[in-house]
Structures are given as structure tokens and as C-alpha cells.
Amino acid sequence: MEFTPLAFESLGVRSQATLVETKDVRILIDPAVSLAPRRFGLPPHQIEVDRLTELAKKIYEEAKIADIIIITHYHYDHHDPGYVIPLDIYQNKTVYIKDPQNFINPSQKFRRAPRFIKTITGKPKTMESADGKVVKYGSTTIQFSKAVPHGADERLGYVIQVAINDKDSTILFTSDIEGAPKNSHIDFIKSVRPNFLIIDGPLSYLLGRALSQDELDTEIKNMEEVVRNGLQYAIIDHHVLRDPNYESVLKPVKEVANSVGCKVISASEYLREPPQLLEAKRRELFQRDNRPAKIPRGLAKLLSAGEGG
């Protein structure tokens, strides 16, 4: 089994788009990209816009030849109703989605999920809610968790975690659990016992606003527990890499991981590419070049639709 991070914060955008390939199927998880509409009081920089365009094209090309597309929830950095990535990626695909009716917050239940489903209806070969299901394709098993909260606060909604096993190894994609603050987050990880983990990390860039110090401490403690669970690799990338101080936030987790032989890295490190922490460095980007960005129409619609994730 091979997996490729396609778009993450360390690659320059808001996303967790991931390609997983086994000898049986090509699986694309959360084919979407976004940017922070405002960060440090500033709009997206042109470099961020250009990078988003580049990675959106990459996701599009990989999506066209995927067999399965999975949508773990309805935030715009995890699903795209056609704003940036063309909807023909869903043509003749098998699509698994987060249940749009149950364990879902109002903004996703009544607006985002219905809009997305309406826009792709008629394109997929099949489309079904995935929460709690297990499906098999040859020697490949895809296991979906029951809906778990998007972090500590259910008001942000719920997500599904995805475990893929090809009999040789298991990769687990946590989606947006914000560093696993709840038992329901880590219980699924423990039950699956993956070799490889892709996890988003805490919302430390919102410490003191949407995250308390006690909550952050709990999330770090739980992530330490997770890396003790027999992992070989943990890619920690997404929410936490929006924080300019992410290295100090993750230092305790990395120390525990090193002690048990687990390698903790970002998506860019996994790909052996230099990090492009563009959102975290937005102030510096504007200090070097403060010209307004040229925002494509689709991206402008996405940014005006709200952050969500």
C-alpha cells in the first residue's frame, strides 16, 4: 500500500487531501483545498492563491483516475461543491460520504451537505453514507468509524475516520478530530492499531479563543497515548501547522514518539519537500509584497461561503 499527501498546511493550503493506493483500488480522501479568508487581519496572499491553484489541479488529476472518493465531513477544506475543483471528478466513481442526516451540525445538515449532494447527484456510480461501515475490495478493507465530534465541541459537527488495510499494513486517516480530545477519537485508533496515522493536530493557533490551555493539554496527552499504540509513522499536519509555534506545541508528542520508535513528521517532510507554511507566514508574505491578490471567481465564492474547518 502506498499513500500520498496531496495538499496539507505544510504544502501551503488548508486541506488533508490524501491518495491511498493498494493493489485493488485507488482511494482519494477529501479532495478539496481552501485558504483562511482572513488571518492576522489579512486576506490571502497571491502566493497562497497560486499554490492553491497548483494543488487543486494536482488533486483533480489524481481524482480523475481514482476508483473511490471519500468525504469525511462538509467543511470546505474537506469537500468542494464545485468552487475550485470541477465536479466531473465524481463521474462513475464509488463515493462514500459522511451521513448527511445524523450526527451532523445544522450548518452542514441543512446547507452544505444538501448542496454538495445535489451538485454531484447523477455523477457517481454509487454514493452512500459511510458512518460505521466496513467495505471490501479484493484484499483491501476500508473501515469507517462511527461519527465522532469535530474536536471537543460538537457544535463544529462530526467527522468519520477512515482506516484502510491491505493485509500488509493499515493506514488511518483521522480527519478533523483536533488532536483527539475525546475517548471516542482514540478508541477507534486503538481498535484499528494502524502502522501509519494521518492526524490533524490541535487548534493551537486559536489558543485562548476557541481552545483553552486545559483542552490543549488533554489533546497533547491523548496524542502521546496514540503514538504509543504501535505506530511506525504519524503525519501530524493540518490544524496545528497553522500555528507559527507548532514545533513547540508538538515537542512533547515527538519526544514520546521517539522513545517508542514512531516517526512524527509533516506531510511535506514525508514527501521530502521543503515546508510551505504559507498561512502561518501570511504577515511575512505581505511584508515582502503587499499587492492585493487576484482571486479567481470560484475561490472568491468559496472564501465568502465561510471558513468551516
Swiss-Prot record:
Q: Which domain of life is it from?
A: Archaea
Tell me which InterPro entries the record gives: Metallo-B-lactamas, RibonucZ/Hydroxyglut_hydro, UPF0173_UPF0282_UlaG_hydrolase, UPF0282_hydrls
TM ranges are none
Name of a matching Pfam family: Lactamase_B
Q: Which family does it belong to?
A: Belongs to the UPF0282 family.
The name this protein goes by in its record: UPF0282 protein Saci_0277
